[in-house]
């Protein structure tokens, strides 16, 4: 019984040749060989032995059996074909989400590439903005530094100018005095000048002594010469006054 399905196609070909239907059945049997194995698996082996032993024209019963077998085999093959078509449709439906996912992945990859391409441009624009802001900051700081340095330089120049003007005035005064002394020495004799100075010193000393006597009589207290000199703001060296002894020297 297990070897009968494998011998079915050969017996069917022999029977078709004997009946004169070889050309019409060849095209159908090529597609239905697989189905026929399942259909003819239920027939007894004696029937197939009868086909092999007697290569005679088929009887009516055999023809009817063949027709029944062909009729029963057609829907089975149609079921198989339908299953194949459904499987192909399922494969297509399964493949379509995969393709859509692939398309989504491709679109995501393209977007990521575009974002990566745009990132350097953004970074370059940000770098440009930062460099421009830094250059502006450095420029403003340099301008402020220049202004501060210029102000300090101007201030120092003003101070030096005022100092120089004071020194010039002092030198001019000293020069004027020296010129006066020279002029007096040219016009007058030095000995005469010394005599005049001595006379003026003696007059000053006498005047202070008289003031001391007058003021002490009014106040009933004797005033010292140092108090009178300090009161009038007279230089001790000009009058040759000695504070320790409270006397005039060289009188």
From Swiss-Prot:
Keyword Phosphoprotein belongs to the record: yes
InterPro entries (UniProt xref): SFR1, SFR1/Mei5
Main location per the UniProt record: nucleus
Coiled coil stretches, renumbered: 149-202
Modification Phosphoserine, positions: 27, 72
Matches recorded under Pfam families: Mei5 (PF10376)
UniProt entry keywords in alphabetical sequence: Coiled coil, DNA damage, DNA repair, Nucleus, Phosphoprotein, Transcription, Transcription regulation
Region feature (Disordered): 88-150
Biased segments, Basic and acidic residues type: 99-135
Gene3D superfamilies membership: 6.10.140.1020
Superkingdom in the source lineage: Eukaryota
GO molecular function, one term: transcription coactivator activity
GO biological process entries: cellular response to estrogen stimulus; double-strand break repair via homologous recombination; positive regulation of DNA-templated transcription
Oligomeric form and interacting partners: Component of the SWI5-SFR1 complex. Interacts with RAD51; the interaction is weak. Interacts with ESR1 in a ligand-independent and ligand-dependent manner.
Name of the protein in its database record: Swi5-dependent recombination DNA repair protein 1 homolog
Lineage, broadest ranks: Eukaryota, Metazoa, Chordata, Craniata, Vertebrata
């Amino acid at each position: 019984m297990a070897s009968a399905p494998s011998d079915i196609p050969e017996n069917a070909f022999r029977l078709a040749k004997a009946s004169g239907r070889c050309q019409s059945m060849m095209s159908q049997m090529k597609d239905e060989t697989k189905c026929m194995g399942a259909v003819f698996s239920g027939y007894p082996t004696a029937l197939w032995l009868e086909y092999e032993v007697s290569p005679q024209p088929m009887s009516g019963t055999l023809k009817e059996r063949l027709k029944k077998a062909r009729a029963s085999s057609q829907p089975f093959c149609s079921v198989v074909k339908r299953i194949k078509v459904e499987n192909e449709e399922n494969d297509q439906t399964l493949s379509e989400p995969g393709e859509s996912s692939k398309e989504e992945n491709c679109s995501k990859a393209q977007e990521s590439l575009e974002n990566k391409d745009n990132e350097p441009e953004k970074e370059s624009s940000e770098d440009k903005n930062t460099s421009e802001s830094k250059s502006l900051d450095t420029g403003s700081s340099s301008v402020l530094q220049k202004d501060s340095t210029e102000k300090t330089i101007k201030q120092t120049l003003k101070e030096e100018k005022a100092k120089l003007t004071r020194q010039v005035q002092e030198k001019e005064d000293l020069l004027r005095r020296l010129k006066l002394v020279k002029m007096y020495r040219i016009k007058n004799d030095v000995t005469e000048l010394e005599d005049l100075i001595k006379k003026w010193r003696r007059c000053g000393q006498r005047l202070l002594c008289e003031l001391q006597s007058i003021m002490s009589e009014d106040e009933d207290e004797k005033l010292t010469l140092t108090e009178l000199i300090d009161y009038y703001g007279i230089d001790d060296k000009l009058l040759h006054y000695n504070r320790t002894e409270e006397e005039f020297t060289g009188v």
